[in-house]
Amino acid sequence: TVHLRTNPALLAFFKENPTVILDGELFVRGKTLQQLSGAARMEKNAYDCDWLQYWVYDCYNSADIDMIASERYKFLEDKFAEAHNFPIYRSGEDESEAPIRLLGHEYVSGWDNMKKLHDEWVSAGFEGAVITDPSKPYKVGSRCNNLIKIKQYKSEDFKVIGYKLGLRGSEDMTFTCELEDGRTFEAMPVGNREIKAEYVENFETKYKGHKAECTFFNYSDDGIPTQPKLRIFRFDLE
């Protein structure tokens, strides 16, 4: 990522705004998470990762910790994008080839409108949507309802052929699920301790060999479900 960290315009921005931390991620539309994370870990050959882009969507200013989201985005538009000639990507526009850009925000209210934008962005090659309360300050190192991620997960049924206990036994167990071609993947079941303990206790007689519904974000380059969760066994399909 040398081409990003040594970008002259980015260095100039930080020199002018030493108390600001940019919040963004490495992303290239059309590339899978597996491809992006693999390129980001490269150290020996910078040319193999010089296609990575840095998308900025928020910032934190230690000199003004009460700056609300709408003010932070206006700051990024004026002091980051306009002042240093970083492009702003807005939905529906042609995408710039610039390695660093600001992701455009859209004001929206109501779940139906949020879902509409989410679906539009996913169909355009993005992962989902992030909803931010424009009247709230940036929260560092904590989860809060100021920022909510929306991701539409896929759902399919897979045969369960085994299980693995975790470091805490059944509490962080995973089920071994089988794909149509015989390959397997691990999926963590949804449920409390009692449910998971029951899964282990009765696996051989009740669950082994049966279909279960798994939700997952997408398929990896190798055709394996990513971020899989086993939601429920589908005895009704048998």
Which sequence ranges carry the predicted segments?
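Nucleic-acid 5′ end/cap handling module spanning
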Residues: 42-46, 59-62, 81-238
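Covalent nucleotidyltransferase
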Residues: 1-94, 238
